[in-house]
C-alpha cells in the first residue's frame, strides 16, 4: 500500500523520530536575539533562496505573518484584495488583512478554490464608483486547503496583456 502524504497543513503531519531529535537539538542551542542572527534560520533562508533561485529569502514563523508582509508590500492600504471566497486569507485571516494591512478582501466564488482568469478580468474591468476602493491585489492560493488541497496549474493563464508604455521625451 502506498503511504498517504497529507500536505494540507503542518498540524496534520506526524514528525519522524529524526525530526523530533533535530527539534530537540535545535532547542538546546543558544539563539541570537537580533534580526536574522540564528544560524538555523540563516541556513534555512539560504536553502530556500537557493531552491527558488533568488538572492535571499526570509523566514516567517507563521503563515499569517508571511501573508501580512506580502500584503503590506504589494497592496496599498485602503485597496481591496480580490480572492476566492474560501481562501485562507479571506476566512481565517480576513480581520487581520483589513486590520493590520488595511486591505479588506473582496471574495468571489471561484472554481474549487481558485479564481478563473475570466472572473479576475471581469471584476477588474467593472467600472468603479468614486467612493469605492480600488482593487489593489489579486490573491491566488496554491494549494488551496479548504478546496481539498487543489493546486493551480503552474502555467495557468492568470495575466492579461498590458499596454506597452509610451516613451516621452522633453523634445516631443
What annotation goes with each model-predicted range?
Residues 69-78, 96:
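Glycine-rich loop at the start of a catalytic domain that most often binds anionic cofactors/ligands
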Residues 61, 83-84, 109, 136-141:
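Short beta-strand segments
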Residues 67, 77-85, 101:
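Membrane helical hairpin/interfacial module
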Residues 7, 115-166, 172:
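Active-site phosphate-binding strand-loop segment of PLP-dependent enzymes
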Residues 1-23:
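N-terminal amphipathic/basic leader segments beginning at the initiator methionine
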Residues 49-52, 73-74, 98-100, 128-133, ...:
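Solvent-exposed alpha-helices and their adjacent loops that cap or buttress functional pockets
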Residues 15-63, 85-86, 90-92, 96-98, ...:
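Conserved N-terminal alpha-helix of the aminotransferase class I/II PLP-enzyme fold
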Residues 92-104, 168-171:
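Active-site-proximal loop->helix
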